[in-house]
Swiss-Prot record:
Disrupted gene: phenotype observed: Aberrant synaptic connectivity of dorsal and ventral D-type motor neurons onto ventral and dorsal muscle.
Function: Transcriptional regulator within D-type neurons that controls terminal differentiation. Required for the development and function of the 19 inhibitory GABAergic (gamma-aminobutyric-acid-secreting) D-type motor neurons, which control locomotion. Plays a role in regulating synapse formation in dorsal D (DD) and ventral D (VD) GABAergic motor neurons, possibly in part by regulating the expression of the neural regulator oig-1. Also required for expression of flp-13 in DD motor neurons.
Name under which the protein is recorded: Homeobox protein unc-30
Biased composition (Basic residues): 110-119
Positions with biased composition (Low complexity): 91-102
Tissue: Expressed in D-type GABAergic motor neurons at high levels in young larvae, in which the motor circuitry is formed, and at low levels in older animals. Also present in six non-GABAergic motor neurons and is absent from the seven non-D-type GABAergic neurons. Expressed in DD GABAergic motor neurons and VD GABAergic motor neurons.
GO terms, biological process: anatomical structure morphogenesis; axon guidance; dorsal/ventral axon guidance; GABAergic neuron differentiation; positive regulation of transcription by RNA polymerase II; regulation of locomotion; regulation of transcription by RNA polymerase II
Keywords of the record: Developmental protein, DNA-binding, Homeobox, Nucleus, Transcription, Transcription regulation
A GO MF term: RNA polymerase II cis-regulatory region sequence-specific DNA binding
């Protein structure tokens, strides 16, 4: 019983000392040797607790939290927020910047827009003249142009840059247009015969083709090369004469020769001469008509000799005159 009373007395003294000093760390530093309990009394008071730990339920109270220690930090945060709000209010309240040219949009200062340069007719004329002579002027040339037309060198440099871009665009379009025109001309040149036929009338082409056919048949029958392939014998328009020559008794072949009269030959060549009325062509045609007359005379002599030698075996002829 005495031991329990001593233990309670020691605990009561500890509570009193704890209530006197709110901070236990400070109270330990401020306690003097008189206020400390003797070691033998503490050991004697804690001895029963080791034997019976459930003798009483005691919990050491925690030190109270000091709210005042957090107040300065909160005050600083509130001051920072208030300063930011004041800055934003100042930014939004000023519609123009320091230069007085730009405006703010959502707190961001926009770059002032550069005004366009309006050139006069005199300036444009001088610039075009310089551009026709030199498309890439150097610094000294640009400065000279700027002084001459009362402009700044950067404005002249920008004008030449834009003018070169415009010139390149026009050149590109011009090359494309010329390429399309070249393809059209090439497509037309792929058919030269059709273009020639279109240049001449159809009646002239038909008459020339018929004359060529007539001359081919006439030459074959003129030199005695008639055959079975010739279905219809050729008959001249004037003075038709047919000869039946029997060369061999055992084999009889019928050759039809049509000697051409001078009038017929002259009429043929006169038709061709009318198609191309040139002095040199007429002289050539008259010469050919004379040679054709000589050939006709030779053929008449040959026909007379052949008609006199009918019924005799065939002998080759010897030609001595000019053909």
């Amino acid at each position: 019983m005495d031991d329990n009373t001593a233990t309670l007395t020691a605990i009561h003294q500890q509570q009193q000392s704890h209530n006197r000093f709110s901070n236990p760390l400070v109270c330990v530093g401020q306690l003097d040797h008189h206020s400390l309990l003797p070691e033998h009394s503490i050991s004697s008071s804690l001895a029963p607790l080791t034997h019976n730990p459930y003798a009483f339920n005691y919990s050491i109270p925690l030190p109270p939290t000091d709210i005042t220690t957090k107040l300065p930090k909160l005050e600083l945060l509130s001051l920072d927020v208030k300063q930011e709000q004041d800055d934003n209010h100042l930014d939004t309240s000023s519609p123009t910047d320091s230069t007085g040219n730009g405006s703010t949009n959502g707190g961001k200062i926009q770059k002032p827009r550069r005004q366009r340069t309006h050139f006069t007719s005199h300036q444009l004329t001088e610039l075009e003249n310089w551009f026709s002579r030199n498309r890439y002027p150097d610094m000294a040339c640009r400065e000279e142009i700027a002084v001459w037309i009362s402009l700044t060198e950067p404005r002249v440099r920008v004008w030449f840059k834009n003018r070169r871009a415009k010139w390149r665009k026009r050149e590109r379009n011009y090359v494309i247009d010329n390429g399309q025109g070249t393809t059209k001309v090439t497509a037309q040149s792929l058919d030269p015969l059709g273009s020639l036929q279109n240049t001449f009338p159809q009646t002239l082409l038909q008459s020339s083709s018929s004359q060529l056919d007539d001359s081919a048949v006439t030459s074959s029958s003129f030199y005695g090369y008639g055959g079975a392939w010739q279905q219809n014998p050729y008959y001249s328009r004037n003075n038709q004469t047919t000869f039946n020559w029997q060369i061999k008794p055992q084999d009889q072949f019928q050759f039809q020769t049509i000697p051409m009269s001078p009038t017929t030959a002259t009429s043929r060549f006169s038709t061709a001469a009318n198609l191309a009325p040139l002095p040199t062509a007429q002289a050539a045609f008259s010469t050919s008509a004379t040679s054709s007359n000589d050939k006709l005379k030779l053929m008449d002599g040959l026909s007379n000799s052949l008609s006199s030698s009918l019924g005799q075996p065939y002998q080759p002829c010897q030609y001595s005159g000019p053909l």
